[in-house]
Amino acid sequence: MNQELNIALLQIAPTDTLQDNLQKGIDACRKAKEMNADIALFPEMWSNGYRMDGRETEEWQKEAIPADHAFVNAFGELAKELDMAIGITFLEAYDPQPRNTIVLFDRHGNRKYTYAKVHTCDFSVEKHLTPGEDFYVCSLDTRLGEVQVGSMICYDREFPESARILMLKGAELILTPNACPMEINRLSQLRGRAYENMVAIATCNYPDSVPDCNGGSSVFDGIVYLPELENSRDTCILQADGSEGIFVAKLDLAKLRWYREHEVHGNAFRRPSKYGILLEENKREPFIRKEYRP
């Protein structure tokens, strides 16, 4: 049986209104389904196109919507109609300040998790957001059976702990909405997170027509070695160019699962008893930042 999971990265540019983003998002999901996608993933904060920079805080915060808003629920209904999981992103209304959120709907329209970005960019406009509290992994029903899926968002990628926690919670696939330039160092981070955790990481960015973005959406399958290959392999199975479009990667679940059962990374040889310093909250120079929020 074919064990390839089709992951569609919706590298599309936002419009100026919630309603137009809803319609454009629906259209993109329908096109992804026509391309045989099992999962469709949006870029970061699709509801308002991550349009916060250069605007008054009160102005963009008014664009926040509840997690049960009609905009969000529409993608749950669409997921059921299309028999395709959808990861929809939005600026979530929350107290005391909005959150940067993804909701994953399964192909039956069920809400599997609501994840808010833990590592908000407190050195910039995201200091006016409420950070998320935890990382979540769900068992996602697909045409290939159950797949363990979690999420991190953009800057979360820059902290090894994000992907590590998701791996420890059982994630096989990490969905990562993004809104920033995907240059060699950020791509290297994703490659490294997939490698060290033996997980697949799918990242969806905005195209280069969006300010401070350049496309480059990617999927790393995390499989460095295969028995039929003499040497290591490139784990990148998809990297988009800068153009607007829908890009589909085929993730071989059978190979990923074999690899996770036999190789040496992930949780195979960790020694948590030696890692106590990782739980310390005291900061020392040169890492003291006045913007930091515990």
Question: Could you describe each region identified by the protein language model?
Answer:
Residues L18, D27-H108, K112-T114, C180-N197:
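Cys-nucleophile CN-hydrolase/nitrilase-fold catalytic domain and related Cys-dependent amidase chemistry
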Residues N2-A8:
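Extreme N-terminal starter segment of soluble prokaryotic enzymes
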Residues Q11-L18:
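Short polar catalytic/cofactor-binding loops
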Residues N21-C29, F159-R164:
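Short, acidic/polar
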Residues N6, G87, T101, G216-S218:
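Conserved beta-strand and immediately adjacent loop positions that scaffold enzyme active sites
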Residues A64-A67, A93-E172, P177-N178, M182-G192, ...:
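Active-site catalytic loop in hydrolytic enzyme cores
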